[in-house]
UniProtKB/Swiss-Prot annotation:
One of its GO terms (cellular component) is cytoplasm. The keyword Hydrolase does not apply. The gene is SHE4. This is SWI5-dependent HO expression protein 4. Signal peptide: none annotated. It is found in: Cytoplasm. The modification Phosphoserine is found at S18. GO terms for biological process: actin cytoskeleton organization; chaperone-mediated protein folding; intracellular mRNA localization; mating type switching. The lineage of its organism: Eukaryota, Fungi, Dikarya, Ascomycota, Saccharomycotina. PANTHER family: FI21225P1.
Length: 789
């Protein structure tokens, strides 16, 4: 059907409609290439209606472009389906770049790859870059996000000389006040710095220097605000470069003149935002404290900028230098800002009705309290404020507060941290590096107070467990950022420090959260991973594995437990290996957790044993720990092996396949370990031998001839007969061995056992004592009946 455009010649859209109709049908082959070219030609006929490539509004809203989805589908399929139609489309685009831009930018962002793909080499894009520069410079094109997305794809696809893209530095900085430009600028600048670091840095410094000159002679379009806004945005990604510019001679003087002499409140806000961003640099924190403290303290008395200045004071972490406010008063500014003025408005009205200036104040207050809640005095203050704590929980669960969620979770993680956990391995997490890589806040002890462990436990029970916060976070985990997930792990870790809280933590999904978090390995090299592994070990130590592993198999936990164990050589799959923050306690608790898993009477227990034994790096770790010089570690390893013997067929080959050199080595080690000075370790070793002797007769038969084993066992049995548990295990070993000795009447004699007076005397002594227990005492006469001395 022909379309008429305001008295002009009609445009026949039938080619567009018929091709789209063909797309809707299931065809064994794509339509003929000519149909694609005809449809493209129809679309590009619209340029006849435009002036200098500018598509007028009446044409943009015309019937021909009413269904933009059809237009986009034709352009995309023409690019994808036939090389001939791709060439034709590319030619039309390159012949009239202004019109092509106007056409494509009214389509969805997914069409960008088609547009950029129509330029096969860098030289072909130079005209496009020139057109883009013009449009960005004049700012008349309302589709700036689309234009900048094209630039980003061009930078990724082609290797330009910096001179060809240098214009981006100036043009984007000059439009820093526009939100659409600001967000894309950060991505584009990151790409430019990656490809042209030296040239890019120089271009930024040079242009910012020119803006400083303009500010000094008071010309240009508010160059000082442009400088402040640009530095604020670039500081997180280009910290060193921004600090170099910030420290430019004379710039501080210009800033202070604008604030104090001209009393420009809006500029003061912008400057305070910059100071807040600059605190990411330790050098700048010192500089700000030394040069801007007067500004910061005076700004505390101006309501509109009070929170802005208070946040900077917090982030400089220089509380000893404050003269007009103390730590408690500083904290109250943010608590009051949320609980009295801001939070009620956000919760009680539609999000669209909230004043724009209130949302940043919420964000800043949360950020400040995330820092301040590292301080014991502030934590005590917040925990004692029941209504404010409930507000924090409401904010966490509010769909309107997702932009603050990371800071809120940091606060809850800090509040739930027990006093003994405030230092050591968790300190590197408490530095809130995801905000500003703040270094060494713990060095300042101002405001330090002693926290009560009992108060923290009450807080954790009331505000985390009873409110089912962990259940809520489990449901939301798939929506959370990696940084937020780390703070969830911290909260769960803190809860698992109390044995009594572990069942509730597990029932709310704590184990699932930790397993899924660790499995994603988004935190390789991060200290937070240690906390995740520690939380898992605590849950596994104090809980029946059968009650935990319903959604997942117990096998899923094994890799993370072994991450806490020392290995002889570093391996890629252990992101924590050789990490100095892994303590002996971590090793010990990981072994206890493995022991609990291995001792499960369900099929999971046997599968755990099989997995450990069959995984070379895991078993190598166990073998090394058997000989560890640390007694608790060695003991726990032997107890793990002893528990694994409840599934003897799984592990027998590792110790009792005596034809295998490594197995024989392990066997000989076990024999010697029977004489360890640590009695609990001896019990574990004795249990290993007792278990194998009473469950696998073929192995028991072979053990009858092992002189060192029998001599050591009898020696320990006789010398340490007072230890009932050790005696019981050795009795079962002897019972298993004597069970496989043939009855009288055969020529088969085993003098090591049957003609051993020392063993006979010790057995009689055990029988006489009468404290071995009915089952074990009943075995003694059976053994004595086969002794021939």
């Amino acid at each position: 059907m022909p379309l008429c455009e305001k008295g002009n010649d009609p445009i026949d859209s039938s080619t567009i409609d018929s091709l789209c109709a063909a797309f809707d049908k299931t065809l064994k082959s794509t339509p003929d290439v000519q149909k694609y070219n005809d449809a493209i030609n129809t679309i590009f006929q619209l340029r006849q209606k435009s002036e200098s490539g500018k598509m007028p509004a009446d044409l943009t809203n015309s019937e021909a472009l009413k269904d933009r989805q059809k237009i986009e589908e034709i352009l995309t399929r023409s690019y994808q389906d036939h090389s001939e139609s791709r060439v034709h489309l590319s030619k039309l685009i390159q012949n009239d770049i202004p019109f092509a831009l106007n056409l494509f930018e009214i389509l969805s962002r997914s069409s960008i790859h088609v547009f950029v793909g129509c330029f096969s080499n860098k030289d072909a894009t130079i005209a496009l870059l020139n057109e883009l520069q013009i449009r960005i410079h004049y700012g008349e094109d309302t589709h700036v996000t689309y234009l900048l997305s094209i630039i980003l794809q061009l930078l990724n696809k082609f290797k330009y000389n910096f001179k060809e893209v240098r214009f981006l530095v100036k043009e984007l900085i000059l439009r820093i006040s526009e939100d659409e430009v600001k967000s894309m600028m950060l991505i584009i600048f990151a790409e430019l710095q990656s490809s042209f670091q030296k040239d890019f840095d120089k271009a930024v410094v040079d242009f910012m220097s020119s803006l400083i000159v303009e500010a000094e002679i008071d010309v240009g379009n508010d160059p000082l605000s442009i400088i402040v806004k640009t530095l604020s945005e670039l500081y997180p990604s280009l910290t060193t470069l921004c600090s170099e510019i910030f420290l430019t001679k004379g710039l501080s003087k210009l800033f202070k003149k604008r604030v104090f002499e001209e009393q420009d409140l809006q500029f003061t806000k912008e400057l305070l935002r910059l100071l807040s961003s600059a605190c990411i640099d330790e050098t700048m924190r010192t500089y700000i404290t030394e040069n801007y403290l007067q500004l910061l303290e005076r700004s505390l008395n101006v309501e509109d900028v009070q929170i802005y200045s208070a946040l900077v004071l917090v982030k400089t972490w220089s509380f000893t230098k404050l003269t007009c406010i103390n730590l408690k008063q500083l904290s109250e500014i943010f608590i009051n800002a949320i609980s009295r003025r801001i939070m009620p408005k956000i919760e009680n009205v539609n999000e669209s009705a909230v004043k724009l200036e209130e949302v940043p104040k919420v964000e800043m207050s949360v950020e400040a309290l995330a820092y301040l809640s590292l301080k014991a005095s502030v934590k005590i203050m917040i925990r004692s404020n029941e209504s404010f704590t409930e507000i924090l929980l409401t904010m966490i669960k509010s769909q309107k507060m997702t932009h603050c969620l990371y800071g809120l979770l940091v606060i809850m993680a800090n509040l739930s941290t027990l006093p003994e956990e405030s230092n050591g391995s968790s300190q590197s997490i408490n530095d809130l590096k995801n905000y500003a890589d703040l270094k060494g806040p713990g060095a300042d002890k101002v405001g330090a107070e002693k926290e009560s462990k009992e108060d923290i436990l009450l807080f954790n029970e009331k505000y985390i467990l009873r409110t089912e916060l962990i259940s809520f976070l489990k449901r939301e985990m798939h929506n959370l950022s990696p940084n937020c997930k780390q703070q969830v792990v911290r909260v769960i870790y803190n809860i698992t420090r109390s044995k009594n809280f572990i069942p509730q933590c597990i029932s709310q999904g704590g184990t699932t959260i930790i397993l899924e978090y660790l499995a994603n390995k988004q935190d390789i090299g991060e200290p937070i991973r240690i906390l995740g592994c520690r939380a898992l070990t605590r849950m596994l130590i104090f809980t029946n594995p059968g009650l935990i592993f319903k959604k997942y198999s117990a096998l899923n936990a094994i890799p993370f437990l072994f991450e806490l164990l020392p290995r002889s050589t570093p391996v890629d799959d252990n992101p924590l290996h050789n990490d100095e923050q892994i303590k002996l306690t971590d090793n010990y608790e990981a072994l206890l957790a493995l022991t609990n898993l291995a001792s499960s009477e369900t099929s999971d227990g046997e599968e755990v044993c099989k997995h450990i034994v069959s995984t070379k790096v895991y078993w190598s770790t166990i073998e090394n720990l058997m000989l560890d010089e640390n007694v608790p570690l060695q003991r726990s390893t032997l107890e793990l092996i002893s528990n694994m013997m409840s599934h003897p067929l799984t592990i027998a080959a590792k110790f009792f396949n005596l034809e295998n050199p490594q197995s024989l080595r392990n066997f000989n080690i076990l024999v010697k370990l029977l004489q360890l000075s640590d009695v609990e370790s001896q019990r574990a070793v004795a249990a290993i031998f007792a278990n194998i002797a009473t469950t696998i007769p073929l192995i028991a038969k072979e053990l009858l001839t092992k002189k060192e084993l029998i001599e050591n066992a009898i020696q320990v049995f006789a010398d340490q007969i007072d230890d009932i548990e050790l005696r019981q295990r050795l009795l079962m070993l002897f019972f298993g061995l004597f069970e496989v000795i043939p009855d009288n009447g055969t020529n088969e004699v085993y003098p090591l056992l049957q003609e051993n007076q020392k063993l006979k005397d010790a057995l009689n002594m055990s029988l006489k004592r009468g404290d071995s227990g009915p089952e074990f005492s009943a075995a003694i006469p059976v053994i004595l009946a086969k002794i021939k001395v």
